[in-house]
C-alpha cells in the first residue's frame, strides 16, 4: 500500500512540475539497422545524409572524432564518407585524412559531393569517387568577408549557384558560382525579422531558398537574391529543411522547446500551413541532425546521438 501511494505522489509531482510532456505525434515505422556497416569499421557521430542521381545514399560520419571544443587540428584518420545502395549495402567509403570536424554533406546535380568542415573553416568539393577537386575558404582561419567562413554548416545548389549556410559563427547565407567565385551574401545575427541565429541547413527549390534558423526556432524562406519572403515558426528547433517535389517542404527538429532530443518531422504546405507531423525517433537516444528524402518517399535521418542512419517510408502526398 505504501508503494502505491509513493507512485501516486511521484506522478502527482510530475504533473505539477509545469514541464510539458513530449509532443504526441504518430510514430514512424523506423528501421534503425538499415546501414550495413562492415564489422570493424570505425563509426561515430552521423551528421549528414544525401542522395545522388543514381539513388546512392551518402552518409557523413565522424568515425573516432566527437564534437568537443576546442577542436583538434589533426584530420580524422578513418574514412568519413560512406556510400550505400538503396538496400543498405555498402558500395564505397572514402575521406580518410581529409576532414577535421565535418558537419554537412550535399550532393549536387553532377554528383559532386560538398562537405563543410567547421574546424577547417572550409567547404570542400569532391568528385563522386572522393577525389578532392576544390576548396573554399582559408584553412583554420575564421572570417566574415568574401574569402572566409565562420563554421560553415551546409550547402545547397541552384543551377550554377552554390548557397552556403555560414553558419555557427557568421549567421549568413553566402553564394558562390560552381568555380568558387563570390556572388553575394545576406543575413546577420539576431532574433528580429532580419536576424538569423545559426543557419544550420539550407535548400533551394523553385527560386526559393529555405534556411533553418535553428536557434530562433523557425524556417526562413528567401528569394535567390536574398529577399525575405516568409518566416515560419516551428515548435522545436529545426536542424534541417528539405523542399518536397509535390510542393511545400519538410523540416526536422532535433530538440523540442524543452531542449529534449528527438526527431520530429513536419510536412508543410507551400502556403506555410502545417500538414502532418511524425515522430521519427529510433529505439534509445535519438537526435536527428539531417535528413534526405528519396524519390519513392524513403526518408533517411542522420542520427548524431544514436550514431546511425534511421529510415522510414514517407508519403508526402498524404
Where are these regions (language model features)?
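Bacterial N-terminal signal peptides
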Residues: 5-15
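Eukaryotic scaffold repeat domains enriched in small/polar residues
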Residues: 17-318
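Structural motif marking the loop-to-transmembrane transition
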Residues: 4-5, 288
Amino acid at each position: 500500500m505504501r508503494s502505491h501511494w509513493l507512485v501516486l505522489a511521484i506522478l502527482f509531482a510530475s504533473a505539477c512540475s509545469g514541464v510539458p510532456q513530449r509532443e504526441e505525434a504518430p510514430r514512424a515505422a523506423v528501421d534503425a539497422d538499415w546501414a550495413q556497416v562492415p564489422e570493424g569499421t570505425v563509426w561515430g557521430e552521423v551528421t549528414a545524409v544525401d542522395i545522388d542521381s543514381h539513388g546512392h545514399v551518402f552518409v557523413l560520419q565522424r568515425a573516432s572524432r566527437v564534437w568537443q571544443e576546442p577542436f583538434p587540428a589533426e584530420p580524422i584518420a578513418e574514412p568519413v564518407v560512406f556510400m550505400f545502395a538503396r538496400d543498405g549495402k555498402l558500395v564505397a567509403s572514402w575521406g580518410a585524412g581529409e576532414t577535421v570536424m565535418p558537419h554537412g554533406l550535399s550532393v549536387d546535380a553532377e554528383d559532386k559531393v560538398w562537405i563543410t568542415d567547421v574546424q577547417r573553416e572550409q567547404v570542400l568539393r569532391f568528385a563522386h569517387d572522393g577525389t578532392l577537386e576544390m576548396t573554399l575558404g582559408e584553412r583554420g582561419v575564421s572570417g566574415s568577408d568574401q574569402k572566409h567562413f565562420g563554421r560553415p554548416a551546409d550547402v545547397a545548389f541552384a543551377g550554377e549557384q552554390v548557397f552556403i549556410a555560414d553558419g555557427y559563427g557568421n549567421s549568413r547565407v553566402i553564394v558562390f558560382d560552381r568555380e568558387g567565385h563570390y556572388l553575394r551574401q545576406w543575413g546577420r545575427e539576431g532574433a528580429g525579422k532580419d536576424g538569423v541565429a545559426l543557419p544550420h541547413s539550407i535548400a533551394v527549390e523553385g527560386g526559393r531558398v529555405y534556411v533553418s534558423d535553428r536557434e530562433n526556432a523557425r524556417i526562413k524562406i528567401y528569394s535567390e537574391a536574398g529577399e525575405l519572403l516568409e518566416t515560419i515558426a516551428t515548435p522545436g528547433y529545426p536542424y534541417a529543411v528539405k523542399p518536397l517535389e509535390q510542393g511545400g517542404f519538410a523540416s526536422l527538429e532535433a530538440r523540442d522547446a524543452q531542449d529534449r532530443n528527438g526527431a520530429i518531422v513536419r510536412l508543410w504546405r507551400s502556403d506555410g500551413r502545417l500538414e502532418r507531423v511524425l515522430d521519427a525517433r529510433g529505439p534509445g537516444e535519438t537526435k536527428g541532425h539531417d535528413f534526405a528524402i528519396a524519390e519513392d518517399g524513403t526518408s533517411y535521418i542522420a542520427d548524431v546521438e544514436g550514431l546511425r542512419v534511421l529510415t522510414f517510408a514517407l508519403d508526402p502526398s498524404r
